[in-house]
Each structure stands twice: as structure tokens, then as C-alpha cells.
């Protein structure tokens, strides 16, 4: 039989599951059930948003204002409260942002305390989100998210270098896509930091190596259209025939009272409130 990978839901760690996640989750889940029914082998992937400086900020907020018992009990709600507080305080005291960055650097460097707290936040988020998935009847085979690809990006960068696809532009390493009428795909920032594109290239290659998919569907909002066109084109340029089997299943965003949803601004409708 043929194998279909479906990348859907893809929640962010330390944020509540809100109504904006409903489209990707239910469209992905529905497609999966249809493919299952048709006899395909399906692999459901929840590509967790579990990397970035915001986790340094979360730890910083926890160290300053958090309480272990309250976080353990309150779970994601308490983490969101701390996150919002951090942003309020950082507006008055910009030095907090530096502290947040320093904590994230600790996570990157494998500091024991930082990793312990980071993994705990992750476990709490999955615990709370699992309740929502149960209500919806949604399951996944893999929760390999952004951090999973940390050690898989060098391979991509080296391969791009070997194939002479990388160009330096304003200090950043890019793949030039001007002949495809697209803006460049940025692989490394000028400070050497990797970006979403680097991770998504690593993820696509890993998925093909691991699952040997016949199709890989990305159920992600239409705003990411250019991003995926860039990724698929770069994979083609790298010589991966299967790039044509990667498909972005785009959908419209849910807005509420005419505004986009933002956890940071507290402008959000939570799914559990809706379902209950």
C-alpha cells in the first residue's frame, strides 16, 4: 500500500489549544480518516512548536514569578499567565528580554536545569492538550517537533553547500529563487542562527527517509503559502525527486470580531471553553 504523511495541528508548547488550531486539526484528521478508509497507510505528525527564544522567556518568568505547585496544577493556563506577565513587565524593563535570551541559550547549550524546566513545560502542555484531542477523537503517530531537528540541520546545510546552492546575501546564507519569481529562502541568519526553512527541509528529508511516503501533506494556513513553495523548490533543486509529492493543503484563518488571534495579546478563544 501507499504511505501518506500528514502534518497537522502542530501546536505550540506552553500555549493553550485555541480555536485557531481547530481548522488544521480537523482538516488533517478528516483527510487522515479518508485515506485510512481508502486503504492507505497514514502517518499523523504533530510537528510541535517547541523551540525558540520564547522558551527562555517562559523559564525566566517562571524563575521570577512562578511557583512549582501552581504550575503543576494549573498547567498551560498558568504558563500562559506567566508568559503574558513577562511581556507586560518586559515593556517596562527591556533587560528582561536579555535574561530570556540567556535562558534560551542555556537550553541550546544543554544546561541541566534549563532542560529540566523546558521538558516539564512540554510535558504539561501535552498533558493538557491530550484532553482536547480526546474530546475531538484525534490521534498522532509522531510528536517530533522543531527541537527534534536540532541535530539534523547541519546535514542539510552541508548538502546545500556541496551542491553550490547557498549564496551569502547581507551576511545571511540563502538559496536564490529569483528564477522562480520567489524571494530567497533564508537558511542561516547573519548570526548563524537557523530558521524555520532549515528545519522544514530537515523534517521533509527525515520523513522521506523514515516513512518513504508517497505523499506528504502539510495542513497549514494559507499565510504559509510562499514558505512551502520555497521549501518544495529548494528540495527540488537539491535533487530530491519526491519534492513533487509534498503538498501544502492551505486553509483560511479564523478571526474573531475581525481580529486575528494572538496569545501574546490575550486575544483568543479557547477550544475547551467552546466545546464545553
Where are these regions (language model features)?
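NTP-dependent nucleotidyl-transfer catalytic core
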Residues: 1-276
